[in-house]
A protein has these predicted regions:
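N-terminal glycine-/serine-/threonine-rich beta1-alpha1-beta2 phosphate-ribose binding loop
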Residues: 2-157, 173-185, 468
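Non-transmembrane alpha-helical segments in soluble domains
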Residues: 9, 78-79, 104, 125-128, ...
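Active-site beta-strand termini and strand-to-loop segments that position acidic
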Residues: 313-319, 343
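Predominantly a Rossmann-like dinucleotide-binding segment in NAD(P)-dependent oxidoreductases
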Residues: 69, 182-187, 192-305
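ADP-ribose/adenylate-binding Rossmann-like module
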Residues: 156-168
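C-terminal helical cap and adjacent loop that interface with cofactors, partners, or active-site loops
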Residues: 11-16, 33-36, 44-45, 75-76, ...
Length: 474
């Protein structure tokens, strides 16, 4: 199947950033392409204004946080942020007043008294205008992340955004450009990079256990059919709508982030090209028909063009490594992110549980040997903060570790563990996979958001806490 110029512009956003009118609406973002010059991923160019790799903003003894989007993830984030030393929640915003009130309940116990904004789709902008906000923490629907992050940086705020950071290549480029021009951090909140086995395998890779890294695999296979077709779980069914008239890997970051760090993508290697293929939709359309037969509410979702059950994307890097990513949030399968690391000296695989390690073809190491490796390669961040993070919670503690390290870096004036180049690159897989699927699995060249700086950039993820690490969990 081939796409014409207009279709490509829709998927990549190269006809314009699509940043206007970014209110807190629950409706799905409709890209509004205009006729423009012919575009191809290989033609995408970013010219660096300032290298944000290793950038350390001035230290903030108290990090004043404005949270925008107080839904499922926003409330969970608030419950974690109030447990971190040096955090002050100064503003909350959501389209729905009841959501803001629920957010207020999350922080009131810890003596935070934030300003509240919920009187319209543009109210979130008032949070960005406030002088008592240092960090904007975004937990809004996907299509709002990039425009809100860009607006926040333009208003002198650091940004931490839920995943994905962007939906189009142009949004990715604009995020990078704005961060470079304003010298404001823009971090995508990829919590899996702080999960315990993922950090252990990163440490193992850095210390040479796997030898030369050859191949990695990641996935987001998580059955969300009932949640997507819920009347209440996602406001105005925004996540269901993201699955209509799109076909690709819509959520690659959970499987990709840790593998990208292990391969030093943006920091000594880079993605070269990607190919992607999707199955047909075997469930979302039929499920919509089944629901609509008994409830007129679901009739607008019948006969829609839903994305395929399974998407598989393969990436090749400049140094010849490969990555396989999968996305399926419909099929009745056990949860998996795979997390496979394959090198010339060893292999690790997290799913299906329990996690395993091997050093030859005869099989996985024994449980006893696994625990010996765990003791040897568990990084300092886990040893120092892991148990407290588990107590605070958030996907077993990784969410808390992520938030804790973000605040710790801001308080001590350190580079963040993940920067805007990571946010852009990992998010770019979404439009690139959509383009490749529509083109019959044709290769899509992956843009270099570092403008060549990847060859000299240094890895950021400080799992050994060589700097900072003194912020307390309360």
């Amino acid at each position: 199947m081939k796409t014409n110029r207009r279709d490509f512009l829709k998927m990549t956003g190269l006809a314009g950033a699509g940043l206007a009118g970014a209110g807190l609406t629950g409706s799905v973002h409709v890209r509004n392409p205009q006729q423009s010059v012919d575009a191809n991923p290989a033609d995408f160019v970013h010219r660096q204004h300032f290298n944000m790799n290793g950038y350390a903003a001035p230290a903030l003894d108290t990090v004043r946080v404005g949270v925008i989007g107080i839904g499922n993830r926003g409330r969970a984030a608030l419950s974690r942020l109030v447990r971190i030393e040096g955090v002050r929640i100064t503003a909350l915003s959501d389209l729905y007043p009841e959501a803001v009130e629920q957010g207020l309940e999350c922080v009131r116990e810890y003596d935070h008294n934030p300003a509240l904004y919920s009187n319209g789709e543009e109210e979130w902008k008032h949070v960005c205008d406030r002088e008592d906000v240092d960090l904007i923490y975004l937990c809004t629907p996907w299509h709002l992340h990039a425009p809100q992050a860009i607006h926040a940086m333009e208003h002198d705020k650091h940004v931490a955004t839920e995943i994905p950071a962007a939906q189009t290549l142009e949004e990715c480029r604009k995020l990078v450009e704005t961060s470079e021009q304003t010298r404001k951090h823009c971090m995508m909140l990829e919590n899996v990079c702080y999960d315990f086995f993922e950090m252990m395998t990163l440490n193992m890779a850095r210390r040479g256990f796997f030898g030369d890294i050859v191949h990695g695999e990641g996935a987001y296979i998580h059955e969300l059919l009932r949640m997507n077709f819920s009347k209440t779980y996602y406001a105005d069914q925004w996540r269901l709508k993201e699955n209509i008239d799109r076909n690709g890997n819509l959520y690659p970051m959970h499987g990709l982030g840790s593998i990208a760090q292990i391969m030093n993508l943006n920091y000594g290697d880079r993605m070269d090209y990607l190919v992607s293929v999707s199955s047909g939709d075997f469930q979302m359309g039929p499920h919509a028909e089944k629901l609509a037969a008994g409830d007129d509410f679901w009739k607008p979702y019948v006969d829609r063009n839903y994305r395929g059950n399974m998407n598989t994307s393969i990436i090749r890097t400049a140094k010849g490594r490969t990555i396989m990513l999968q996305h399926d949030v419909t099929s009745p399968r056990p949860y998996t992110r795979i997390h496979l690391v394959s090198g010339t000296l060893g292999t690790a695989r997290k799913y299906p549980a329990p996690a395993r390690i091997a050093t030859d073809h005869t099989g996985w190491v024994s449980e006893e040997e696994f625990h010996e490796l765990e003791e040897r390669y568990t990084p300092e961040i886990t040893r120092r903060v892991g148990e407290m993070a588990r107590e605070v919670g958030g996907h077993g503690g990784m969410d808390t570790l992520m938030d804790w390290r973000l605040i710790d870096c801001l308080r001590y004036g350190l580079p963040l563990d993940m920067d805007v180049y990571d946010a852009a690159l990992w998010s770019a897989v979404i439009p690139l996979s959509e383009w490749s699927v529509a083109q019959g699995a044709m290769p899509a060249r992956v843009p270099d958001f570092t403008d060549g700086a990847w060859e000299s950039n240094r890895p950021l993820m400080d799992i050994e806490l060589e700097k900072g690490g003194s912020t307390r969990l309360l």
